[in-house]
């Protein structure tokens, strides 16, 4: 994975949490993969297609968060062990979250933010009051 400056990882976390201004800044300032990751989290097909071509490790991270074991294996086999841990942690693996918080807090916080987004999406999908209104 490309080595990102700490402030860019922090910005990515903010974008994941819904800061559209920062997401758009990432897109325009040589970090389109991080901005498109945010779109792909919300099932944007064109963003997922772009990630598949240009940053498959980020798409595999999203798929791993969604519980796809083959995506986690792909990350581990291809040298993206940290992203595999992020995906597992964001998919409710407490042991991986604990490891991240002890060993790479920046990516631990990133995993927490991804988990919150995915939990919100799942809650909305399960809310019978919202069915048919989106």
Locations of regions flagged by a protein language model:
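Ankyrin repeat (ANK) tandem alpha-helical domains that serve as protein-protein interaction scaffolds
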Residues: 1-134
């Amino acid at each position: 994975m490309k080595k990102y400056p700490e402030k860019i990882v922090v910005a990515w976390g903010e974008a994941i949490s819904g800061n559209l201004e920062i997401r758009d800044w990432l897109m325009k300032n040589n970090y389109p993969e991080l901005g498109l990751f945010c779109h792909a989290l919300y099932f944007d097909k064109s963003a997922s297609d772009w990630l598949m071509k240009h940053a498959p490790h980020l798409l595999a991270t999203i798929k791993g968060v969604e519980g796809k074991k083959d995506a986690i294996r792909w990350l581990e086999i291809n040298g993206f062990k940290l992203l595999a841990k992020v995906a597992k942690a964001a998919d409710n693996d407490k042991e991986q979250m604990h490891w991240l918080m002890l060993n790479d807090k920046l990516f631990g916080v990133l995993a927490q933010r991804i988990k919150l987004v995915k939990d919100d999406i799942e809650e909305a999908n399960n809310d019978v009051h919202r069915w048919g209104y989106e």
